[in-house]
Amino acid sequence: MNAQAVAAALSAWGRLKRALFLALGLMFVFVLWRSERFIVDHSHPDWAYYAPVLWWLVPHGLGGLIALVTGPFQFSSRFRQRHLSWHRVMGRCYLAGIAVAVPFSVYLSLTHATLAFRFFLLTLAGAWLFTTAVAFVAVLKGHVQIHRQWMVRSYAITTTFVTTRVLTAIPSIGGGGEVIYVPAQWSLLVATMVLAELGLTWRALFAGVRPSMQNQSR
């Protein structure tokens, strides 16, 4: 594979990454309007259901929001190279957001979800905490590449904060009852993690080729 092909592949990956973050942003706006409006609009049908656990739900939501917003900056090589100190600050904010969101999500899962959905939510919370903890330990030990790989896995799970709500907005899924939407969310989680692994493989393959191509051109 020549240097031009490698450069084209990396450029395509950069464009795809920007497109994914744009799509995520649009989905987030949709979710705010459709699923979270009850927080300020108490006439919304969901208000009566969530009002008893509002003060558990808000910290969970804010923690997830912090992770969701700060995450994309962690994957920008340009931002990391130009603003390393800010990269680290935002990384700490990302960790803090998840550290807040996970305990509240566990409580909400145990008290406000059916058994089948509870198992999914607890698995999601455990995977979110585990992937983030591995990324954190890796960077503390100086294993930057491993840190980046696990951050991708962690952020993939973070995106389910949005994508699962978009999924249940589909009438045939959200209105189909637990027997439909719980398997659908499991499928979405698996697909999300598979896509994350494919992205890691793509990036590692061409990032690994690029230095050798540069050496050959000298």
Residue ranges and their predicted role:
Residues 1-218:
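Alpha-helical membrane insertion/targeting regions
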